[in-house]
Amino acid sequence: MEEAELVKERLQAITDKRKIQEEISQKRLKIEEEKLRHQHLKKKALREKWLLDGIGSRKEQEEMKKQNQQDQHQIQVLEQSILRLEKEIQDLEKAELQISTNEEAILKKLKSVERTTEDIIRSVKVEKEETSGASIEDIYANIPDLPKSYVPSRLRKERNEGIEDDEQNRKALYAMEIKVEKDLKTGESTVLSSIPLPSDDFKGTGIKVYDDGQKSVYAVSSNHSAAYNGTDGLAPVEVEDLLRQASERNSKSPTEYHDPVYANPFCRPTTPQREKATPGPNFQERIKMKARGLGKDMNGSIHTMNNGLSEERGSSVNHISPIRPIPHPRSMTQQAEERPHSPQKRQMTPWEESDVTQDKCAPSAKSQLSPGEAPVGKSERQGSSPTCQEDEEDVRYNIVHSLPSDVEDTEPVTMIFMGYQRADDSEEEKKLLTGYDGIIRAELVVIDDEEEEGEGEAEKPSYHPIAPHSQVFQPAKPTPLPRKRAEVNPHENTNHKSPHKNSISLKEQEESLGSPIHQSPLDIQIAGDGTEDPSLTALRMRMAKLGKKVI
């Protein structure tokens, strides 16, 4: 009762205080209005006094004096009202201060008498314990057809309150250990691993950072000991995020699957594959005829000139690119496969072979290959007469590697490019050179050992005896094809070489070249001049500087 009275007194004091504050605010507004009127009347009185000095009539002066007296009276009344209002405001402020002091005293008494929330909760619990549950049971007893074993939920809750409050008796249904790494800069938490634990082995060690009645989260350090006491609690959003990351990590499959791979050869993709160097049906026969006369050495370099066109091998397609015939350096050592050659054709000289091929099938101008055509695979398209097809394709020549039989085939052969030699632009030569892609001719230079150098100086001169008239150094007549030479083919570049043993000797070559049948107009012209070839002169000078002799 005392507490209620104190509360009423406090509320009354607050109400009175509020009324006084409103009165004070109204009186202050009224004072402001009175002050404005007082100022206005003062200005009016001064103006009338100034006008009174300029009036000459007596009647008007009397009227002005009466008006001035009235204004002065109003000014005095306003001044008195202003003073009175100010005094009232002071009294109200004193009353407000008195009410405030009384309110503070009532509040102190109320705090001493008023119970705290804990006291109220405690008293409620005591009242519940004192009151018996007979009243609730009486209420449910009046309900018909109610089983005797039925216990109201309120009673069950009250009976189980003590057990629920005891956290040690609460058993965990599921436990999981989650290793979390927290970035101190961004504050983001990343789940490193999650390991489920049996609920029986779980021990609530650590500091509890979250508990909503269904889930409990404990902070444990890396060494499975309790974390430091300064661990902050987790918000429900953070707990849900960690559980989501852990569930996503567990749901990920450890194996990564890819598209099915089929080994069926019919399901092979249509992308271009790298072709293997396997000859076709007529490919090996063509190699037998064209590869004769080439060096067997593994380091020999081959360069084909076809009217300034050279075939180079790409990834899987043959590319034809126009380039100038320039000397290539010695190629890298590669493993080469020896191709079997027919012994009957090996015994034939290149001139006999060319005569035989011309008699069988004379190539026409239309059948010859143009510079832009590729010779690969033409024998497969025309398989009826392979000899004629090979003659048509054999317009392009390779380097002449005709070595004498006494030269060992194990030694490498090196060719030195000494320059070009131009032919006169005559009509007959243009006709003869139709389809002519260019043939490289080289001088055979044998460099002896130093021991044999002294013996050979007395017998052999230091220059070639028939250099101006030698057919080895002059361009041969292109009409009678001397012999089929191996092309630079993507499949023949490094793997097809013919032995030197099948090549004709130098003496036989000079005799065959010296015959009038194979002399070209260029040979006759140079022989008539009696001048030496500039390439031979340069070669002789170079050999003389090296101390070697030229055969």
Swiss-Prot record:
PTM annotation (Phosphothreonine): residues: T271
Cross-link Glycyl lysine isopeptide (Lys-Gly) (interchain with G-Cter in SUMO2), where in sequence: K125, K179
Superkingdom to which the source organism belongs: Eukaryota
PTM comment, free text: Phosphorylated.
Signal peptide bounds: none
Cross-link (Glycyl lysine isopeptide (Lys-Gly) (interchain with G-Cter in SUMO1)): K179
This protein's record includes keyword Acetylation: yes
InterPro entries documented for this protein: Paralemmin (IPR004965)
One record GO biological process: regulation of cell shape
Quaternary structure, from the entry: Interacts with GLUL. Cell projection, dendrite. Cell projection, dendritic spine.
Name used for this protein in its record: Palmdelphin
Source organism: Sus scrofa (Pig)
Organism classification: Eukaryota, Metazoa, Chordata, Craniata, Vertebrata
Gene: PALMD
